[in-house]
A protein has these predicted regions:
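Selective transmembrane-helix segments that form parts of the transport pathway or gating/packing helices
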Residues: 42, 46, 50, 89, ...
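Short hydrophobic alpha-helical segments within the ABC transporter permease transmembrane module
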Residues: 81, 85, 125, 129-143, ...
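Membrane-interfacial helix-loop-helix connectors in multipass membrane proteins
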Residues: 63-87, 153-196, 205-224, 245-255
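Active-site cofactor/substrate anionic-group-binding motifs, chiefly glycine-
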Residues: 39-93, 97
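Hydrophobic alpha-helical transmembrane segments of multi-pass membrane transport proteins
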Residues: 77-120, 205
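Short, membrane-interfacial amphipathic segments enriched in basic
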Residues: 2-32, 209-214
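Generic alpha-helical transmembrane segments of integral inner-membrane proteins
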Residues: 51-58, 142, 146, 150, ...
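Short cytoplasmic-facing helical segments at TM-TM junctions of multi-pass membrane proteins
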Residues: 110-135, 217-220
Length: 255
């Protein structure tokens, strides 16, 4: 894709995001569609997210436990492991699962509607496809991402705690005490904010690629692949920005 085409596509995407933002305040609210999409996204995301979060938490605990022992700071294993899961691993795992499972399904659904000309028919009938289809999916993805991030964080921290205590001989009291000493409420909030933003980004990219799909069934498949890849890239870039802003704005305990 050439430079002008990339800029044009980026402009169209941001215009699409603005249209979706305007649609958030419009009535009537598509409650039925929202509930259906929230249930669908959660049903395809809960089990994979829970299963992935266990090894994530375990690997983080094992790696950090080994590192802090080499540095002579074994008492801080709990703080390092829990903060890594809550701030970074939890939202990232949540976003990747939602983008891979829920986002691909959203893109495929809207892409199929596009090639069957259902979206054009809705516009002819005076129905805004963005308000009717995109807004409920974005809101559902945001809600599920926030709730799922809580589950992933709990499972990941529990897995890290278990592996640290059982496999590395850590002390349960020291594991929890170090987190209490260095952790703070904004650490939990930033994880939820990340999950909220990641869920919105995943749904917006998937919806945009689906609604602009063309070329028949093959085009829909290509749009799904592109949406997943673009979402992963956007999530890591967004994670860097949010993390950088967080460390600049929120003073850290013990610093």
């Amino acid at each position: 894709m050439s430079g002008p085409a990339v800029r044009r596509e980026t402009g169209h995407f941001f215009a699409f995001c603005l249209d979706t933002l305007r649609g958030l305040g419009r009535r009537p609210v598509q409650v039925r569609e929202f509930v259906q999409q929230a249930w669908f996204i959660s049903s395809v995301s809960i089990l994979p997210a829970a299963l992935v979060s266990i090894p994530f938490g375990a690997v983080i605990a094992l790696q950090l436990g080994s590192l802090v022992r080499q540095l002579g700071a074994q008492s801080f294993t709990g703080a390092a492991s829990v903060l890594a899961v809550v701030r970074e691993a939890g939202p990232i795992v949540t976003a990747l699962v939602i983008a891979g499972a829920g986002g691909s399904a959203i893109c495929a659904d809207l892409g199929s509607r596009r090639i069957r000309e259902e979206l054009d028919a809705m516009q002819v009938l005076g129905i805004d496809p963005i308000h009717r289809l995109v807004v409920p999916r974005v809101l559902a993805s945001m809600l599920v991402a926030v709730l799922l991030n809580g589950l992933v964080s709990v499972v990941g921290v529990s897995g890290g705690y278990l592996f640290n205590v059982v496999m590395q001989g850590g002390t349960p009291g020291a594991y929890l005490a170090s987190f209490q000493a260095l952790g703070q409420l904004p650490d939990l909030l930033v994880g939820e904010v990340k999950a909220l933003l990641f869920g919105a980004a995943a749904a917006l990219i998937a919806s945009y690629k689906g609604m602009t799909a063309k070329g028949g069934p093959k085009g829909v498949g290509d749009a799904v692949n592109q949406s997943v890849v673009l979402t992963f890239m956007a999530l890591f870039a967004l994670n860097f920005v949010v993390t950088a802003v967080y460390f600049q704005v929120v003073p850290q305990k013990g610093s």
